[in-house]
Amino acid sequence: MGRFHPHPDSHPHPDSHTHPDSHTHPDSHTHPDSHTHPGSVGDHSGYSTGAERVEVLERILGENERVARANRAAFDAAGVTVVNLMSAPGAGKTMLLAETLRRLAPHRRIGIIEGDIETSLDADRLEGFGAAIALVNTGNGFGGECHLDAPMVASALPRLPLSELDLVIIENVGNLVCPAEFAVGEDRRAMMFAVTEGEEKPLKYPVMFRSADLVLVNKTDLLPYLDFDAEAFRRNLDAVHPRVDVLAVSARTGEGIDAWCDWLANLLGAPGVAPIQR
């Protein structure tokens, strides 16, 4: 879908959000676990090919932009900062978030919007850390939607106590293309790349790398066992997005997680974080 939706080559970077049917409101620093049932997110799969398909896609993207602006207004009104976390399937987003919540949830009020095609498995893994969690399953359509769009995120907002949160992290559906196509009202985008994916990924899937404000290079604990050329990866990344921030992390060992948490904390500490213009 990238050919239907323009992506600027650059955008501003900073310097350097089910199971129980109810939830309890958090105190000033921590949240009791809140894990709510997903709602219907609709089906975008029924369009035709050719000119009709282009017209329908343009309508979808236009409506998405409208809802993304409404989401952004809701986030601004609540005073909450929002990060859209994207990656390929299996890159390690959920494990990263578990480690993030372990460190930040005692000090910051955090909500998670968990996007998956089916199941609540990842949302379940994030229980017990004090975050409010809203699950969105995208399984309608032919195999399910491969991304969260702005209306899907909007469907999760009534299930989060936005006015009581400092930070919402959206764990997008695992996919290297579609999530980057749809703004959801976020302040910043972080992309997780696993070294097991190979150093050519920025060249093969440039849209997501280009749209990211931060690239997290995960699974560094596996580097001794892989034929991964870190210098070639960085050259390829620079060819696509030379100004992007990069952090090496291992969600399994904890390497780099404090630096990632510092990146998030800096966003929260910056008054009036400016939304990215895409």
Named regions from a protein language model:
Residues A88-P89, I113, I117, A194-V195, ...:
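G-domain G4 guanine-recognition motif of GTPases
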Residues P179-D187, F193-V244:
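Conserved C-terminal guanine-recognition region of P-loop GTPase G domains, centered on the G4
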Residues M1-V83:
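Extreme N-terminal, non-catalytic leader segments
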Residues L222-R278:
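Canonical P-loop GTPase G-domain recognition
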Residues L96:
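Hydrophobic positions on the alpha1 helix immediately C-terminal to the Walker A/P-loop
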Residues Y47-A73, A77-V80, A91, T100-E186, ...:
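Nucleotide-state-sensitive switch-loop elements of NTP-binding domains
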